[in-house]
A protein has these predicted regions:
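Conserved PLP-binding catalytic core of the aspartate aminotransferase-like
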Residues: 83-91, 100-143
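Glycine- and other small-residue-rich loops at beta-strand/loop junctions that grip anionic moieties
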Residues: 6, 53, 166
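Alpha-helical structural signal in soluble globular domains
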Residues: 66, 92, 96, 100, ...
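PLP-dependent enzyme catalytic core of the Aspartate aminotransferase-like
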Residues: 129-132, 138-185
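Short acidic/glycine-enriched loop/turn segments that link adjacent beta-strands
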Residues: 11, 112, 156-159
Length: 185
């Protein structure tokens, strides 16, 4: 899946989902307009279910060539450089947070793209409802205007935070987050 509005600064609604052919029979959309019972012809059930899920506006997809070309001009980097920039920023952000919270990174840097998940220490893991917003997430958002996913998970048990890096992020934002996390945990 590619969320193009986040990673390409494209309009919302331009995301796509790729599924390996051998797994397509296991994946179904949340809403099926008419593809469930349509005769297949030369197509697959996967295509019938996903290709037409109802009324849609394709204009977000139509502007993608413009977005791709103009974002590189705007920042003066090609796409390979943008990807490298975001990856390096995510790695630096993870290091800043891990160092501040005295956490060993859960995986080597080569496994990081532009998103990094960090297991944070918490005495509350067993007390947090999996189906409710994590209190730390709420506190970060309401008290500090920080929007970052925080959740608890039963296996492997722990409380996690996920950071992402994009051209509009800066290292000092990860330092700010690390300082706030240190205060809140």
């Amino acid at each position: 899946m590619c969320i193009r509005d986040r990673w390409l600064c494209a309009p919302k609604g331009s995301a796509f989902l790729h599924v390996r052919k051998d797994l397509q029979n296991l994946i179904h959309p949340l809403t099926i307009s008419h593809g469930m019972t349509t005769p297949l012809g030369n197509s697959t059930r996967f295509r019938h279910e996903f290709d037409w899920t109802g009324t849609r506006d394709v204009s977000a997809w139509c502007v993608l060539p413009f977005v791709i070309e103009n974002l590189t001009k705007l920042v003066g980097m090609n796409w390979s450089e943008i990807i490298t920039h975001n990856r390096n920023l995510a790695i630096r952000g993870r290091k800043i947070i891990c160092k501040k919270l005295n956490i060993v990174p859960p995986c080597p840097d080569y496994m990081i793209s532009s998103i990094a998940t960090i297991k944070i220490s918490s005495n509350q893991v067993n007390e947090i409802d999996l189906y409710e917003p994590d209190p730390l997430h709420v506190k970060l958002l309401e008290d500090y205007d920080i929007q970052v996913p925080v959740w608890s998970w039963p296996n492997p048990q722990g409380r996690y935070i996920r950071i992402s890096a994009q051209l509009y992020n800066y290292e000092d934002e990860y330092e700010y987050l690390a300082n706030i996390l240190e205060k809140c945990l």
